[in-house]
From Swiss-Prot:
Protein name: Probable disease resistance protein At5g45440
Cited PANTHER family: DISEASE RESISTANCE PROTEIN RGA4, PLANT BROAD-SPECTRUM MILDEW RESISTANCE PROTEIN RPW8
Keyword terms of this UniProt record: ATP-binding, Nucleotide-binding, Plant defense
Function: Possible disease resistance protein.
Lineage of the organism: Eukaryota, Viridiplantae, Streptophyta, Embryophyta, Tracheophyta
Domain annotation NB-ARC: ranges: 38-116
Alphabetical list of Gene3D superfamilies matching this protein: P-loop containing nucleotide triphosphate hydrolases
InterPro entries the record matches: NB-ARC, P-loop_NTPase
Entry keyword annotation includes Cell division: no
Species the sequence originates in: Arabidopsis thaliana (Mouse-ear cress)
Length: 346
């Protein structure tokens, strides 16, 4: 997962495609309720860089995550937390903000950002193996080590089969166990912070990392074995899936729900900042315009920003009439599938 700023997590081409996909789904999105989690088949690769936009309305959420990471009363304990919320609510941006917080950077080493979606081909690879390799790469482990582990595992399984020995472990399970051991050694005695962004069911990453090994169980069977305890390690997940979130942590209070913004002024600031970034004239910010934006975006920061990127909203009735639109809205908003919407540059 690259640490470089590629338009803050998206390449320029990716942003164009992403904005077009947003336009294609906009009418459908407006019809969903606030309680629904929008599951989109398209995912994007993210990185640890600061979001390329200001964050508004999440002051309390930022303080809550700072407390989770910097609480001196639980300095040595391993703790995990899930940020769960619907598509576009700002989970990734919130975690990027806290990941780069000055005090957090000074308190944790190493800090590793894992985008659960990768643009690299994973065809035929196990989800757990891919994630473990990503973490280990962030710790400086080279590809040659992974090749060596895989080669030794395949050879061991082959030799056992030829000798008629069966130990109940598949080659994949042995490889995962070896990677967990390597991870444990690299994280041992370190106060680490790992963020798993956009965890979904298909990733096959659905175990509690603070689970303890039961008596008689073999080490390396569970993901938790790879994450040392006792040095103050922290893990943060983001996910859209409420049920998956419950599988990732032990206690309910370890689930942090991120809701759409209820403060219409914060939503307007998000929209206005994007308009100004694109050097466009801001619409008047009277109550009618703010309420209309709140209704269209449903309080979702991503929706507010992309509405501005799609060059959609002319709230001024006079300007709207000059452009031949109705009720102060342009055709590109009423029909975001229009060619005008799809060809807007970013």
């Amino acid at each position: 997962m690259t640490q470089e700023d590629s338009s803050r997590g998206l390449t320029s081409v990716g942003r164009v495609d992403f904005t077009n996909r947003f336009a294609d789904r906009y009418n459908e999105w407006l019809g969903t309720t606030g309680d629904e989690t929008k599951q989109v088949e398209d995912r994007v690769e993210t990185d640890s860089g600061l979001p390329g936009h200001d964050i508004y309305g999440f002051e309390n959420e930022i303080k809550s995550l700072q407390h989770f990471l910097l609480d001196q009363k639980s300095y040595k304990l391993f703790k995990s937390l899930v940020v769960v919320g619907e598509y576009g609510v700002g989970k990734t941006a919130l975690c990027q903000q806290i990941f780069n917080d000055y005090d957090v950077r000074n308190a944790y080493a190493p800090r590793i950002w894992v985008s659960m979606h990768s643009n690299e081909s994973k065809e035929g690879l196990d989800g757990k193996i891919c994630v473990l390799k990503t973490i280990l790469k962030g710790l400086g482990v080279e590809e040659s080590m992974f090749e060596s582990i895989h080669r030794e595992v395949v050879e061991e399984v082959s030799n056992r089969q030829e000798a008629g020995e069966i130990d109940g472990e598949t080659a994949k399970e042995k490889e995962i166990s070896a990677l967990l051991y390597a991870l444990h050694l690299n994280l041992r005695w370190k106060k680490y912070l790992i963020v798993f962004d956009d965890v979904q069911e298909i990733d096959n990453w659905d175990e509690k990392l603070d689970a303890k090994l039961n008596e008689g169980e073999k080490w390396g069977k569970y993901l938790s074995d790879g994450f040392p305890k006792g040095s103050g390690g922290r893990v943060i997940y983001t996910t859209r899936d409420e049920n998956l979130a419950k599988n990732l942590v032990v206690q309910k209070h370890e689930i942090h729900r991120l809701w759409p913004l209820s403060d219409s002024n914060s939503v307007w600031k998000i929209y206005e900042a994007m308009i100004q970034k694109r050097e466009k004239e801001s619409p008047r910010n009277d109550k009618k315009c703010i309420d209309e934006l709140m209704n269209k975006s449903r309080g979702l920061p991503l929706a507010a920003r992309l509405l501005a990127e799609l060059d959609p909203m002319l709230f001024d009735d006079g300007k709207a009439n000059q452009n031949g639109s109705k009720d102060g809205k342009t055709d590109s908003v009423d029909n975001p599938n229009s060619e005008e919407s799809k060809t807007k540059p970013l």
